[in-house]
């Protein structure tokens, strides 16, 4: 199984994402918020891919995405931004920063499966 990191301050959303990824055959770890995520990532965690929320208190997902794309061991890790913010400007911003895709909440198993196929984790 491949390990995914889910970063979302909403426990219900994070747990639902985890369940969907488990159904697709992936082991998951969850960071309930940006502080927990930064602790895990700074501690050397290098997941196979990351599901990242944007709107979180404190350090938001945009800042985390920037960090992911500056850290040498995290640069190649695919990032799927999963957010309720469906503004075209947000999509442009996260894609420019290096996200692999943006999924609008509520995420579906089909949307996750499509994102995983793009990065060749699923056929």
Predicted regions and their residues:
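Charged docking surfaces used in two-component/phosphorelay signaling
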Residues: 15-23
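Receiver (REC) domain active-site loop signature in two-component systems and cognate sites
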Residues: 56
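C-terminal output helix
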Residues: 107-116
